[in-house]
Amino acid sequence: MSVKGDIGVIGLAVMGQNLILNMNDHGFKVVAYNRTTSKVDEFLEGAAKGTNIIGAYSLEDLANKLEKPRKVMLMVRAGEVVDHFIDALLPHLEAGDIIIDGGNSNYPDTNRRVAALREKGIRFIGTGVSGGEEGARHGPSIMPGGNEEAWQFVKPVLQAISAKTEQGEPCCDWVGKDGAGHFVKMVHNGIEYGDMQLICEAYQFLKEGVGLSDDELQATFNEWRNTELDSYLIDITADILGYKDADGSRLVDKVLDTAGQKGTGKWTGINALDFGIPLTLITESVFARCVSAFKDQRVAASKLFHKTIGKVEGDKKVWIEAVRKALLASKIISYAQGFMLIREASEHFNWNINYGNTALLWREGCIIRSRFLGNIRDAYEANPDLIFLGSDSYFKGILENAMSDWRKVVAKSIEVGIPMPCMASAITFLDGYTSARLPANLLQAQRDYFGAHTYERTDKPRGEFFHTNWTGRGGNTASTTYDV
């Protein structure tokens, strides 16, 4: 009798193929299936040639070739396609078998699938996988959540193929029940949007404002690799800025300035609004991509308003350091807001997410991997109840040290006409978050004026609510008390 597979993978696009090859490299026997079965043969005769990878030509064939409990990983497009494959798989599975969704599914879908499949005796895991094609092949960041009973069976495979920290720790651990893994992956993607936009704002300020040459820009980002900004996105930015087209000019200058998006940043912003978390920077990064898409409108508007960008005067080195500090401080705010959203969701759904472990999952293998994620892990290990990352002594010190230069950069960008929506929103958030008193007293009075929404008083206990006739005619005031 032939040896059966340890795990099956459905979907032979590049991500699926690379994960399979990664699993094979780590000694796991993988059964590969694709709806278009000719792709199975192409894979077996191509990248998988000479390996122990097994082909399957139907879902029944796939199930028959797997050890029990069967473990089947879906690497297919998120949405209805996932439900289609689940429904098609069910007749060939039995109680205790495991389905893993490794795509970018929206976490409510994962919540639904975990519950529905539990009733059928099938254990479902929704896992975020980050790192792109290279990560999938050589070690991605993996964020599993769902039915915790399944974790012991898939843990050896997923942790083996994941990226590892310098200390050898796997960038894969159990996140929480139901849709916790896909929620954390969604926030990861939102932070990715923010990081990319912040880098672009620094790039434009230095290029068009300060007037750095192409060589100076590349050198600057190369130098930043040796600072707290050290990260995958800084690395690739330095590479991009140095890449020359056939004519010797920088290719990046010929790339059309319209950015695409797949929707996960939008999901993060929508969930922030639903949970009441001020995810200002990430939401602005999504809107920045939306503005970039209005290319024709922007060109017309620039002519209509005679838009020009002013020159940033002063020592280039001084401005480069100021921008570096502003970029780092803004990045801290982005992560702080992201973890605030994760905390709120974890408490709402009772997921019990370990925030330090979440930072570890992102330390290597994924798009947002960076040096200071180790510091984030340290902060949450020192204080698991930390609400605002900027309150940690390490990050508080960076924010305070950067404050003057941060304000200078944002103010100068407004003066010369360079849009910096994310850096500006970051410092504005911090100013608001650290303000003991905000003008919301007037706002709440306005709400009470036109809608009788009531208000609390500073000279009365919290929980006692008042309504006033603000016209001065009648002078009526009502008082009620209820829990808030």
Swiss-Prot record:
Pathway the protein acts in: Carbohydrate degradation; pentose phosphate pathway; D-ribulose 5-phosphate from D-glucose 6-phosphate (oxidative stage): step 3/3
Listed GO MF terms: NADP binding; phosphogluconate dehydrogenase (decarboxylating) activity
Signal peptide: none
Residues annotated to bind NADP(+): 11-16, 34-36, 76-78, 104
Known role: Catalyzes the oxidative decarboxylation of 6-phosphogluconate to ribulose 5-phosphate and CO(2), with concomitant reduction of NADP to NADPH.
Gene name as annotated: gnd
EC number(s) on file: 1.1.1.44
InterPro entries named among the record's database cross-references: 6-PGluconate_DH-like_C_sf (IPR008927), 6PGD_dom2 (IPR013328), 6PGDH_C (IPR006114), 6PGDH_Gnd/GntZ (IPR006113), 6PGDH_NADP-bd (IPR006115), 6PGdom_BS (IPR006184), NAD(P)-bd_dom_sf (IPR036291), Pgluconate_DH (IPR006183)
Annotated source species: Aggregatibacter actinomycetemcomitans
Assembly with partners or alone: Homodimer.
UniProt-annotated catalytic positions: 185, 192
Family: Belongs to the 6-phosphogluconate dehydrogenase family.
Protein name: 6-phosphogluconate dehydrogenase, decarboxylating
UniProt keywords, alphabetically: Gluconate utilization, NADP, Oxidoreductase, Pentose shunt
A Pfam cross-reference name: NAD_binding_2
Binding site for substrate: 104, 130-132, 188-189, 193, 262, 289, 447, 453
GO biological process, one term: pentose-phosphate shunt
Reaction equations catalysed: 6-phospho-D-gluconate + NADP(+) = D-ribulose 5-phosphate + CO2 + NADPH
Top EC group: oxidoreductase
